[in-house]
Amino acid sequence: HETLANIHGQSQGSGGSPYNVLLDLAKMGADFPLQGAGLVGKDALGQYILDDCRRNGIDPKFIAVNEDALTSYTDVMTEKEGGRRTFFHCRGANATWDGSDLDFSASDCRIFHLGYLLLLDAIDAEDPEYGTRGAALLAAAQDAGLKTSLDVVSEDSDRFARIVGPALKHVDYCILNEIEASKVTGIAVRDGDK
């Protein structure tokens, strides 16, 4: 804190819930279509993601390029002693993607995985019919016959019920840790043996 901290190593990779799920399925040899959806910037990181998808057998046809925004990225700093991590995140192009360009009828996929609510500003925006744009997108996927799954980001805020709540009606599989579940439901997490 306000002193020099040395960096002892660096690596680059793609990540995030949807990408990690796709990559894991590709590496397991999934015998069904894998397609990415979202938005990257017209920059080296965006090109890296598109190339990495293709290299791993993930069809990037639903990943658009925004010429006016940076590709979203996270710098993760891990303490050498103890392994505690701090995440510095640039929302970039992800903040502007609302999924309106996604045509589920043009996809051969069977499941739509949305991640991360609370980190995608346009997806988290209000929708007059569904509550949020994310809920509308999940409903559209279900209407097209896809199963849906959802992952959220852990944050210290009061937005969970407002943003995640409406989406739950349109989710087949929801991935929450105990802290996220507590914030969505309003039920306090038990503290140890109490």
Locate each region found by the language model.
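Ribokinase/PfkB-type carbohydrate-kinase core domain
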Residues: 39-41, 50-65, 69, 76-194
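Hydrophobic alpha-helical segments and their boundary regions
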Residues: 4-7, 72, 104
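Glycine-rich phosphate/adenosyl-contacting loop at the front of the ribokinase-like
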Residues: 1-55
